[in-house]
């Protein structure tokens, strides 16, 4: 007799506790985006400086990045929390250090912090300098 395979329901919109995960911080000169994923790369929660209410040039401030990181961690705690995490930072923006500082203060144990900012090995020509 064939064995019945249990159907696993979708976890979308449901609460799921993630014991270990990855916190991605993408800091550009215009905005800071914080995404929390599990170890497989499935997004659990996210936030950005623009989604937290900052508009225009205020999105690129360190305070807006701190607010985005706190908001992403708060959403994560509401879903069940996370004990251990890794931080992966990308981009040269002004909010990268402030966002990682806010994550450290939240109580999540960090295993390591990695910087994956893309650096050209003399690749494409950069845009011309602004003359204001």
Curated annotation (Swiss-Prot):
Please give the biological process terms from Gene Ontology that the record holds. Answer: translation
Subcellular location field: Plastid, Chloroplast
What keywords appear on the UniProt entry?
A: Chloroplast, Plastid, Ribonucleoprotein, Ribosomal protein, RNA-binding, rRNA-binding
Q: Which SUPFAM superfamilies match?
A: Translational machinery components (SSF53137)
- Give the signal peptide range: none
Single GO MF descriptor: rRNA binding
**Primary location:** plastid
Query: What are its GO cellular component terms?
Result: chloroplast; ribonucleoprotein complex; ribosome
Q: Which InterPro entries match?
A: Ribosomal_uS11, Ribosomal_uS11_bac-type, Ribosomal_uS11_sf
What highest taxon heads this organism's lineage?
Eukaryota
What subunit structure does UniProt give?
Part of the 30S ribosomal subunit.
Q: Which family does it belong to?
A: Belongs to the universal ribosomal protein uS11 family.
- Report the NCBIfam families cross-referenced here: PRK05309.1, uS11_bact
Q: What is this protein called?
A: Small ribosomal subunit protein uS11c
What organism, scientifically named, is this protein from? Huperzia lucidula (Shining clubmoss)
